[in-house]
């Protein structure tokens, strides 16, 4: 049994262990990006190759291709490796076109705004 020295511990906790692997990156604004990590720096700025943005609305999803994509480190919330041998999504999810997912996002945003305005109008009733 060997003990991992400081170098091994440092490398296993850094982004170096994810180089050339397919990753899922969750950003502060809620976007989900997928791609292969090609480079990074000390500020966690990262370069994804073959990147795409996965947009999910209800049971519909769309992968919007972005190509080579640079991510500013301060916007990263979470980085995780994708298991290439497992299904990425549950079987009930339906793949749709970019135009369809944009329409679905707009409808969802409008419904959310309507709920917010209704909540403000009913605030005086003090429901919680």
UniProtKB/Swiss-Prot annotation:
Protein name, as recorded: Sm-like protein LSM1B
Signal peptide start-end: none
PANTHER family named in the record: LSM1 (PTHR15588), SM-LIKE PROTEIN LSM1B (PTHR15588:SF20)
Main location: cytoplasm
Gene name, Swiss-Prot/TrEMBL: LSM1B
GO terms assigned for molecular function: RNA binding
Record note on disruption phenotype: No visible phenotype under normal growth conditions, but the double mutants lsm1a and lsm1b show severe developmental alterations, such as delayed seed germination, reduced root length, epinastic, chlorotic and small cotyledons, small and serrated leaves, abnormal venation in cotyledons and leaves, dwarf plants with early flowering, short siliques with reduced seed number and small morphologically alterated seeds.
Gene3D superfamilies cross-referenced by the UniProt entry: 2.30.30.100
Keyword RNA-binding part of the UniProt annotation: yes
UniProt subunit comment: Component of the heptameric LSM1-LSM7 complex that forms a seven-membered ring structure with a donut shape. The LSM subunits are arranged in the order LSM1, LSM2, LSM3, LSM6, LSM5, LSM7 and LSM4. LSM1B subunit interacts only with its two neighboring subunits, LSM2 and LSM4.
UniProt domain Sm: residue ranges: 10-85
Gene Ontology biological process terms in this record: cold acclimation; deadenylation-dependent decapping of nuclear-transcribed mRNA; hyperosmotic salinity response; mRNA processing; response to water deprivation; RNA metabolic process
Keywords: Cytoplasm, mRNA processing, Ribonucleoprotein, RNA-binding
InterPro entries: Lsm1, LSM_dom_sf, PTHR15588, Sm, Sm_dom_euk/arc
Organ and tissue specificity: Expressed in roots, leaves, stems, flowers and siliques.
Keyword RNA-binding: yes
Domain of life: Eukaryota
Function summary: Component of the cytoplasmic LSM1-LSM7 complex which is involved in mRNA degradation by promoting decapping and leading to accurate 5'-3' mRNA decay. LSM1A and LSM1B are essential for the formation of the cytoplasmic LSM1-LSM7 complex which regulates developmental gene expression by the decapping of specific development-related transcripts. Required for P-body formation during heat stress.
GO cellular component: cytosol; Lsm1-7-Pat1 complex; P-body; ribonucleoprotein complex
Family under the similarity heading: Belongs to the snRNP Sm proteins family.
Localization in the cell: Cytoplasm; Cytoplasm, P-body
């Amino acid at each position: 049994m060997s003990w991992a020295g400081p170098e091994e511990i440092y490398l296993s906790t850094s982004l170096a262990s994810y180089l050339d692997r397919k990753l899922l990156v969750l950003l502060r604004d809620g976007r989900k990006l997928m791609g292969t990590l090609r480079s990074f720096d000390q500020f966690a700025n990262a370069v994804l190759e073959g990147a795409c943005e996965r947009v999910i609305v209800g049971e519909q999803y769309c992968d919007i291709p972005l190509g080579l994509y640079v991510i500013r480190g301060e916007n990263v919330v979470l980085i995780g490796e994708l298991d290439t041998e497992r299904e990425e999504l549950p079987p009930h999810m339906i793949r749709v076109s970019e135009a369809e997912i944009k329409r679905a996002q707009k409808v969802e945003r409008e419904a959310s705004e309507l709920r917010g305005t209704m909540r403000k109008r009913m605030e005086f009733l003090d429901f919680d």
